[in-house]
C-alpha cells in the first residue's frame, strides 16, 4: 500500500474516532458507540488484493449531523440573500412589511393581484405585468408592495421606485451615470413603477418615462405600474408623448381598477377618533 495514502487514511480515521467506538466482531469493522452503525467499510476485492482493506465512512449520526449543518448553512445563505433582495427592492419605499397575509381587508382587486404573484412563473415567462389604476388611497401601491414581498420570498429580484424619483434621478445624472441608472432599472426580475403621473409634466419628464417603459418592454421582463390616471384617459390621450407612454404600458400590462373608499381617509378618521378620545 502506498505509505502516503496510508497516512491519509490514518489521519481521517483519527479525526473520525470517538472514545465509545468499538470493533464489531461480526465483520471486524469499527462502529459508532452512539448510533451503532459502521464507521468503516471494506474496499472492493480488487483493491483488497493490492493491500487496501478498509476505509473510513460516516456513521449514521455523523451523516445526519452533517446534513443538518448543510441545511442550516443553505437556509442561512437563503435568508441572507433574501434580506439583501428586500433592502435593494425598497430603497426609497417603506414597503418591506406589506404582505397579502397581513392586509386589513382583502378586496377583489387585491385577490387578483395575489393571483398574479401566485402565477408569477407564467407571467414572468410571458413578460406580462400589471397596471394598477384608480383613485388616491385605494391600495394600489400596497398591492404592488405585496407582490414584491411575495416574489422576494421566492428569491426573485424586485425594484420598487416612484416614477417621480426615477425622472429626478435621470435629470440629475448625465452620460455614463444615466446609463448606469437605466441599467439598474432593467436588471431586476420585476420593476414596479409607482405613481405614474406624479412626475413633472414636462417634455423632458415624458421622454424619460417613455425611455424607461420602452427599454423595460424590450427586455421582455414584467413591470407593474400604479397610477391615479383613469384608464379611459390613458386610452384616449390626445398628447402624443402621453399616448406613446400609455400605449407601451397597455401593450404589456393588464389593467386592474382599484375603486372604493380611500383607505388613507379611513385611517385618518380613525386616528382623529383615537386622538379625540385620548385628549378628552
Q: What are the functions of these language-model segments?
A:
Residues 97, 108-129:
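P-loop NTPase catalytic core of nucleic-acid-dependent motor ATPases
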Residues 156-157, 187-190, 219-225:
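Loop/turn-to-beta-strand initiation segments
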Residues 1-110, 266-280:
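A short, basic N-terminal segment
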Residues 108-117, 148-188, 200-203, 207:
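Short glycine-rich substrate-engagement loop in P-loop NTPases that contacts/grips substrate
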Amino acid at each position: 500500500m502506498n505509505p502516503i495514502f496510508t497516512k491519509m487514511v490514518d489521519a481521517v480515521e483519527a479525526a473520525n474516532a470517538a472514545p465509545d467506538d468499538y470493533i464489531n466482531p461480526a465483520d471486524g469493522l469499527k462502529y459508532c458507540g452512539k448510533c451503532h452503525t459502521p464507521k468503516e467499510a471494506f474496499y472492493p476485492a480488487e483493491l483488497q488484493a493490492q493491500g487496501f482493506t478498509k476505509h473510513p465512512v460516516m456513521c449514521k449520526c455523523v451523516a445526519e449531523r452533517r446534513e443538518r449543518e448543510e441545511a442550516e448553512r443553505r437556509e442561512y445563505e437563503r435568508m441572507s440573500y433574501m434580506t439583501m433582495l428586500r433592502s435593494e427592492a425598497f430603497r426609497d419605499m417603506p414597503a418591506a412589511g406589506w404582505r397579502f397575509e397581513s392586509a386589513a381587508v382583502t378586496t377583489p382587486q387585491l385577490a387578483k393581484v395575489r393571483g398574479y404573484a401566485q402565477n408569477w412563473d407564467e407571467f414572468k415567462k410571458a413578460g406580462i405585468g400589471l397596471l394598477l389604476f384608480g383613485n388616491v388611497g385605494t391600495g394600489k401601491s400596497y398591492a404592488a408592495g405585496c407582490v414584491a414581498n411575495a416574489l422576494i420570498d421566492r428569491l426573485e429580484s424586485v425594484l420598487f421606485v416612484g416614477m417621480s424619483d426615477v425622472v429626478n434621478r435621470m435629470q440629475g445624472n448625465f452620460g455614463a451615470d444615466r446609463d448606469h441608472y437605466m441599467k439598474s432599472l432593467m436588471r431586476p426580475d420585476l420593476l414596479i413603477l409607482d405613481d405614474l403621473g406624479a412626475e413633472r409634466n414636462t417634455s423632458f419628464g415624458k421622454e424619460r418615462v417613455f425611455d424607461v417603459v420602452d427599454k423595460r418592454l424590450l427586455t421582455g421582463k414584467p413591470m407593474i405600474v400604479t397610477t391615479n390616471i383613469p384608464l379611459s384617459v390613458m386610452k384616449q390621450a390626445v398628447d402624443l408623448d402621453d399616448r406613446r407612454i400609455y400605449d407601451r404600458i397597455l401593450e404589456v400590462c393588464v389593467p386592474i381598477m382599484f375603486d372604493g373608499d380611500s383607505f388613507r381617509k379611513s385611517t385618518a378618521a380613525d386616528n382623529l377618533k383615537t386622538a379625540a378620545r385620548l385628549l378628552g
